[in-house]
């Protein structure tokens, strides 16, 4: 039984009339769940079980569109989320980059809609007087699963499809980098995978242009997942570039082989120790440019670890080819990491070199970084409403 069948046959949160017609399919109905209102067209079926996040970051739920026979992931955001400037910037940044890269086949489609919960007949699942008023809904295509789910629930497929999945990630990031954009927050949880193992990215909340100054680069970056962050972003080197994406893909590559998480990364300090155990301790020259004195001193006092054999020991099922690529991707010094062009030319990918590659013919920037970071909640919400809302 497919997910859509489960949704259709479940206890639907859909008020009468239950028969979908041309005249009523686009009518909006509202519900409240855990004190939060959700507004959806009648043609989109949801259940309590398909609401899987309801917190200060918004309400995330899955719907099945009866019109298009497509599964969707929708995130509802109220003005409260925009009052957190970090959350607001993340949303606006994601909108800009999603729109810019939306035509690429490896980027998930999205759209934004604006809806009101007021003056609509409400079916209360949980008694609550709360009404969020006007909200924004971010809609994304739903894939069969995420790369995170694939790695942890189907290790055989993860291992077998490893070269294909990795090649797609590399060529997608190569395309994004060609636009002068660093993704910065690659994570298996934000990489969608379908049944043919084709991948799509669906989150650009921390993406940034290479023309951004260092102080702005690190302003929001503390919120990104530690296990996939490159060493130079942890110890805050003065320079940063596309190599931090190469590191993140290298970590994901290792997880595809392992079938589990490579680094626990519960804190900055523990992650630096784990990295040292994998690829050896760094030299003074490799971290002397750090702008974070505490991190620099901490890493220089880590007990010496050998630079040889750590990857093989940690990932014993990796082939010689895979170890060679991992050693080229996972280096303390970002300038010593293999560029993506070199990686995809490795014989390991010989069965996939026929896949079409794309290059962006123009650069993208959000404009003045200092102006962007001074935007307040109302300004951010207005920009999204004016520039990105595609339906009332």
From Swiss-Prot:
InterPro entries noted in UniProt: Kinase-like_dom_sf (IPR011009), MAP_kinase (IPR050117), Prot_kinase_dom (IPR000719)
Gene3D superfamilies: Phosphorylase Kinase, domain 1 (3.30.200.20), Transferase(Phosphotransferase) domain 1 (1.10.510.10)
GO cellular component, one term: nucleus
Keywords attached to this entry: ATP-binding, Nucleotide-binding
Keyword Manganese found: no
Record keyword ATP-binding present: yes
Transmembrane parts of this sequence: none
GO biological process, one term: intracellular signal transduction
Molecular function (Gene Ontology), one example: protein serine/threonine kinase activity
Residue ranges of every copy of the Protein kinase domain listed in the record: 46-349
Signal peptide interval: none
Chain positions recorded as ATP binding sites: 52-60, 75
Comment field on protein domains: The protein kinase domain is predicted to be catalytically inactive.
Family of this protein: Belongs to the protein kinase superfamily. CMGC Ser/Thr protein kinase family. MAP kinase subfamily.
Name of the protein: Probable inactive serine/threonine-protein kinase DDB_G0280855
UniProt source species: Dictyostelium discoideum
